[in-house]
Amino acid sequence: MAVYTELAAETLEAFLGTYDIGTLVSFHGIAEGVENSNFLLRTTEGDFILTLFERRVNARELPWFLGLMQYLAGRGLNCPLPVSDRSGTALRSLADRPAAITTFLPGVSATQLDANLCLELGKVLARLHIAGEGYDAVRPNALSPAAWGPLLDSCGESGDELSPGLTAEVRKALQNVEAAWPATADLPRGQIHADLFPDNVFFQNGQVSGLIDFYFACTDFLAYDLAICLNAWCFRDEKTFEPSFAAAIMQGYESVRPLSDAEKAALPTLCQGAAIRFLLTRLYDWINTPADALVTRKDPLAYLRRLRHFQSASHV
C-alpha cells in the first residue's frame, strides 16, 4: 500500500455520503507498499480501507479483483469484502481515479518472522487456492515471464548504477528461466494472490486473521504463488536464506493441498522467476517513483540475492 494521490477531507466526506457506512471521523494515508493510494478511514460505523487505483492496475480489470475478493470471502477466506454504495456499486471514481472501499481486517502484519508463522502462511495459501476453485473468470498474469524482458528494457542501464553488471546478469538469468518455464498445461492453475508478502498477511495470536491487497491476483500456476512466498518469507534481513522457514511453508501448504511431482520439480525455476519479477518491478519503481510520494521504496538488490540463491539450489 502507498499514497500517490492526496485527498481533502471535504472531498472524502462528499464521497462517503453515498454509502451507508456512517460519517467520517478521521482518515490517514498508509505508506506501506508501492502500487495504489490507500487510506484508513474511521467512520461512526467502524474502520474501512479506501483504495485509489494507480499505475499498473488496469481499470477494466477492477471488477475481476473485487469479484474475486467477494467470492473468496463467501467461501470462508478472511479477505477484504468490497463495500457497495446505496446504488449497489462497489467501484466508483474519486480524484479522477477508480476507487473502492473495502472492509477493515483485524490483526497486524508480522515484523519478526519465524517457522510457526511460515507454517500458518503455507496453510492459508493452500486454502486460498482451494477457495478460488469455481471462480471461473480468467485474468492472465500481466507480470508473467513475457512481461519481464520489456520491463528490463524499460529500465535501460539504470540497474548498473545500483550494481555493476546487473542488467547483463538479469538478462542472462531471464533467458535461462524462460527456456525452463513450464508450459501452460504442465502444472495446476487457478486463482493466485501473486503478491502475498508479509505486509499483506495479518496475524492475531499466531494465527492468520486476514489476507489483503489482491490487486495483483491473477490466473496462473498455483505453485508460482508458492514460489513468490518462498522468496518473500524465507530470507532473514533480506539476505540470508532460512531453510526452516521454507520447510515450514512447504509443510503447511502440503498439509492442505499436496503438490504434484511436477510442481515440486518446477519450484526451483518458479522461484528464480519470482525473484526476477520482483527484482524488475522494484528496479522500475526505484527509478520512477516520484520523490514526493508517500511510499516506501523497496531495494531491488534484495531480489538479486534471492535470484542467486535459487540459481544455486537444486531443490526447495
Curated annotation (Swiss-Prot):
Its EC number is 2.7.1.39. Keywords: Amino-acid biosynthesis, ATP-binding, Kinase, Nucleotide-binding, Threonine biosynthesis, Transferase. Pathway: Amino-acid biosynthesis; L-threonine biosynthesis; L-threonine from L-aspartate: step 4/5. GO terms for molecular function: ATP binding; homoserine kinase activity. CDD domains: HomoserineK_II. The keyword Amino-acid biosynthesis applies. It catalyses: L-homoserine + ATP = O-phospho-L-homoserine + ADP + H(+). GO terms for biological process: threonine biosynthetic process. It is an enzyme of class 2 (transferase). It comes from the Bacteria. Gene3D superfamilies: 3.90.1200.10, Phosphorylase Kinase, domain 1 (3.30.200.20). Coiled coil: none annotated. Belongs to the pseudomonas-type ThrB family. This is Homoserine kinase. The gene is thrB.
